Each structure stands twice: as C-alpha cells, then as structure tokens.
Curated annotation (Swiss-Prot):
Keywords: Amino-acid transport, Cell inner membrane, Cell membrane, Membrane, Symport, Transmembrane, Transmembrane helix, Transport
Keyword Metal-binding: no
Membrane topology: Multi-pass membrane protein
Organism (species): Pseudomonas putida (strain ATCC 47054 / DSM 6125 / CFBP 8728 / NCIMB 11950 / KT2440)
Transmembrane segments: 14-34, 44-64, 79-99, 138-158, 175-195, 214-234, 295-315, 327-347, 353-373
Annotated protein name in UniProt: Serine/threonine transporter SstT
InterPro entries: Na-dicarboxylate_symporter, Na:dicarbo_symporter_sf, Ser_Thr_transp_SstT
Single annotated GO MF: neutral L-amino acid:sodium symporter activity
GO cellular component: plasma membrane
Location in the cell: Cell inner membrane
Functional description taken from the UniProt entry: Involved in the import of serine and threonine into the cell, with the concomitant import of sodium (symport system).
Reactions listed under catalytic activity: L-serine(in) + Na(+)(in) = L-serine(out) + Na(+)(out); L-threonine(in) + Na(+)(in) = L-threonine(out) + Na(+)(out)
Keyword Transport applies: yes
Amino acid sequence: MTPFLRILNRTSLVTQIVIGLLAGIALALLAPAIARDLAFLGKVFVSALKAVAPVLVFILVMASVANHRHGQETHIRPILWLYLLGTFAAAVVAVFASMLFPSHLALSTSEATLSAPGGIAEVLQNLLLNAVDNPVNALLNANFIGVLTWAIGLGVALRHAGETTRTVVEDLSNGVTLIVRVVIRFAPLGIFGLVSSTLAQSGLDALLGYLHLLAVLIGCMLFVALVMNPLIVFWKIRRNPYPLTLLCLRESGITAFFTRSSAANIPVNLALSERLGLHEDTYSVSIPLGATINMAGAAITITVLTLAAVHTLGIQVDLPTAVLLSVVAAVCACGASGVAGGSLLLIPLACSLFGIPSEIAMQVVAVGFIIGVLQDSAETALNSSTDVLFTAAACQAQEQRHG
C-alpha cells in the first residue's frame, strides 16, 4: 500500500469531506476558471448516487421486510408507537420551519423539465400510478414510489420462502450497502468539485444559502430534542420530563454526535438503560429496534431538503400535500438506518411527490453531503438519544401504572 493510501485510510471520511469543502472554496476564490473546469468531479459523484439509489432502496427494503422476525414488536408496542409519533412530529416541525424560513439552493434546472402537481388530488393520483409502475421501469427511471411498492410486496412474499432464499436476499443487501460505502468514499472529491464549481458560477451567495439551510436543519433538531420530545415524554410519564431528557442527551447524544452512527451507539444506550434500572427484556429489544426505525433526525433532513428544492423551483405547496410529505418523510426515515447517507439518498422519493425529477433531486442530495459534516452528526445525536429517552419513558409509565 502506498503512503498516500495509508494516509487516506487513517483519515476519517468527515475530515476528508471538510478538506474537500475548504479546498473547493479556496479554489473557487483563487482560480474560478479552473474551478469551473472541475465541475465534472461533482457530476460524476451525483451520477454515481443516481445509479445506486434505486437499487439500494429496492434491495434494502425487500431484505428488511423479508427478514423481519414475527412477534418482535409485541413486547414493546408502547415504545414502537412513541418512535412513530416522535418521527412524525419531527417531520411536521420540519414542514412548519421550512414554511417559516424557506431555503433556496443553487440548482441547475436546465437538464430536466418540471411538472409541478396541481394539489393533493393530483399528488395522490400520481402516487397511485407510480406505485403500480412496472418494476423494471421504476428502477430504470428512478421511480422511488414504484421501487418501494415492489420492494415491500416482494419482501412480504419472501417471508414465506426458505431460510436459504432469505439469506441470499440479506447477502444482496450487504453487497449493495458495500457499493454505497464505496461511492460515499468518493464524497470528498465530489464535494470538492461541486463546491468549487458552484461558488465559481454563483459566488458566495450559494454558500450563504447552505448556511441558512444548515441553520434550519439544526434549529429543527434542537426544537425536537428540547421541546417536542419532552412534551411526548410528559404526556407519557406525567411529570417534569427535562431531567430524563437532558440525561439522555448528555449520556447518549454527545457520544452519537461524534460517532455519527446509531448502530455504534447501541452499547452506550444499553448501558444507560441498565443504569436507569429499566427492564432488560424491554430495552434489549427496543434499543436495537430504535436504531433501525426511530429516525426523527432523518425525517427532518428529508423534509427540510425536499422543501428547500420545492421553494427553489417555485412550486406551490398546499397544506394537505405538506401533511402527506410529513407522512412520507416519516415512513422513508424508518428505512434510512444502516446506510451511510441513508436519509439523503431517500430525498428523491420525497421529491417525486412534487414532480421533481431525479436529476434535480440528486443535486439536492449532493447539497446534503456538503453540509453533512454537521447535519449527519446532529441527526444521529437526535435519533440515538431519542431511542433511550422513549424506552425509559415507556418503562417508567408502565411502572407507575403497576406500582
């Protein structure tokens, strides 16, 4: 292995993305002509994301549904409902924040034609038509609603298949996830090309747009962590929720912020649950499950970035469509775990509700990677700390009822 590759392997992806980001800004300011010529790096990265996203959603969802263990949720139904309520509430907060503080992105719309929906009826009609699309056509044209429908359908059918078949599906899922990891490893180069060319063409206004977007995202996550989650916990335990909320943020959220992985934070959450004296039979199931489906941060990311694209393109959004987006974002978020940049790669699915084509949706995904250094850390901190918070709230409420 060459010294360069050794350094590359030792340096974390976050550090590489920061270096790519700073190098892109520097090049755009010092040599705008060269920066414009390097736009192809960003285009290659976005094309790779476009290629892998439909296959990723199809295989991942199918494997998840096919390998679901029957009866898993029966022990933890109250916690499961808290997870779903928290994720939906986060999406609603993100919708209102995006309406109050609309973000505008520097997107290239020349390569695609827009077909904005007329209202909720048309959105639902398009949703139904997309859901019954030919599966091969859905994969080719990145029709994520169709891909999702076929993935769930096949997953349910394969539940009754033999163990060997389900193992093959799981292996396929691992293979696709590995390919996604390889694509994500090229994020620093892609971001370097995207930032340098965008700044060279649009000036510093584009960067200020990203800062505004990041402020909306982090603001939503803080609001959910410090206002919405405590309200849900108070409704459950009927006493001051803040000691428990702040304990979970301090003990679980800070670790998750730096590891940027809900899965890596599972041992931390299990240890905290034990210290809180919760039932082991409950938390040993609910914490790993929460790392998979409790995705309030992902719901915020999907909603805010989708509505940023909508505002940039001048598409009008009525209230029923915004509520539908909240539901779709919450459902999408549940499938975003375990994949690097998972929530970002599900943005095209939400964008398709508004008739935004894949070419533009993937530019929004690329913007997500640019701000991902902070966005992903904050998202993981919210997701993981909420796992242990809702588990503790449900266990304490159960004790109060029986005590």
